Amino acid sequence: MMLNDSGTIGFSINGKSFPATAPIVAKRGDWVEVHYMNEGQMIHPMHLHGMAQIVIAKDGYPLPQPYNADVVDVAPGERFTVLVHADNPGTWVWHCHILNHAEREDGMFGMVTALVVTP
């Protein structure tokens, strides 16, 4: 997921702002590997509902001790690799945990996507 907060489109994931972001689709039991890359100028604490993120690498280097994270703080220029065990069927929100990066008065926008886990 390329995270960006600058430019003409504002807060975006992979160059798109919600609702135009593409969901990640996985079958129940799959392992999903996601690479966070913060190309913007602000920190983005990335949060997935319904499942843990296992942080396995930072800036391209495997971690000697991977760890579970509810939120992964991705600072400008940082890169993280996470694994998610897609073991909970449903549609799960995946978003920046800074409220004004993902939500406003008329609903969700910006740094929001979903993980869809099929049975």
Task: Outline where the language-model segments fall.
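Copper-binding active sites and cupredoxin-like electron-transfer domains
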Residues: 1-119
